[in-house]
Amino acid sequence: MVSNLLKVVLAIETSCDETAVAVVRSDKQVLSHKVLSQKEHVVYGGVVPEIASRAHINYLYDLTSQSIEESGCDLADIDAIAVTSGPGLIGGLIIGVMMAKAISSVTNKPIIEVNHLEAHTLLIRMFHDIDFPFLVLIISGGHCQFLIVHDVGCYQRLGSSLDDSLGEVFDKVARMLNLGYPGGPIIEKKSIMGDSKSFFLPRALINRFGCDFSFSGIKTAVRNIVVNQKYIDNDFICNISASFQDCIGDILVNRITNAIHMSQAINCKINKLVVTGGVAANHLLRNRISICVKDNNFEVLYPPTELCTDNGIMVGWAGIENLSKGYVSNLDFVPKARWPLESIKRSS
């Protein structure tokens, strides 16, 4: 085990379209955090992998230098380097991992390969005193899944999306309505002014046992409505946005209820649900989820809204959690576009 002295971790996140670097300390202090959200993708209505990779190349070195300088540390003060190694866009992952390995090699500091989903999952422990085990729902642009978190590096999947991720569906619906990218915040804003009962959308799998998701049918239903709509004005956009959000809320409530029952059947000590990932920043969905969880005698916890999307702080904290267990990596690890959270294997 690593000693109980304060540890300082330099963290690098390049798994998608955010280039982020942070310096985080084991007493939960953020010494610096630099994040650059790439605006280049807006015109395309989604992330273009090649553009994302080139942007990481252009920004990562300067962001790393700025983050170290802002932290008041130098490389000698860093105890370890944590880097997102997957899942994600392979081009961006390679760039982040190469930078982290270079720093580790030059400084002879340990390196920790971090699973992006583990970083989202463990971040809650930086802000709340939550013990293992607990239930987590990850809802983001690339993932939608329930897992039991037994410990750092020990996860059990209960259910996941059978097709699209939830964040992906928000982006695609926003694109159908010419609302721009990212779609989630825009649809949430429009839905506030709309009538959620204007259009009926299918609630896939809602009457089935389990906690898997399917969102492709909702996406198709919205497309059919948009194609057949003669006039697409602001009222229509607000109403379809509200109907879409209401549909997603119904599905989440149903799936969360099932996941709670499944998790307690596995371990009756589980009484907390963590909701994380970019879609967890949606306050209308948070309200629906919070009511559902309370009705099921559970407690729900969310990371700070600004840290629901990808960031360096979560990678740094995951690095600290792994370092506290003595989990470090060899320099020969490779980035992985796919890396299921339940498949993590740790060695100290």
Curated annotation (Swiss-Prot):
Keywords: Acyltransferase, Cytoplasm, Iron, Metal-binding, Transferase, tRNA processing. Binds 1 Fe(2+) ion per subunit. Its cofactor is Fe(2+). Pfam families: TsaD (PF00814). It is found in: Cytoplasm. One of its GO terms (biological process) is tRNA threonylcarbamoyladenosine modification. It catalyses: L-threonylcarbamoyladenylate + adenosine(37) in tRNA = N(6)-L-threonylcarbamoyladenosine(37) in tRNA + AMP + H(+). The keyword Transferase applies. Belongs to the KAE1 / TsaD family. This is tRNA N6-adenosine threonylcarbamoyltransferase. The gene is tsaD.
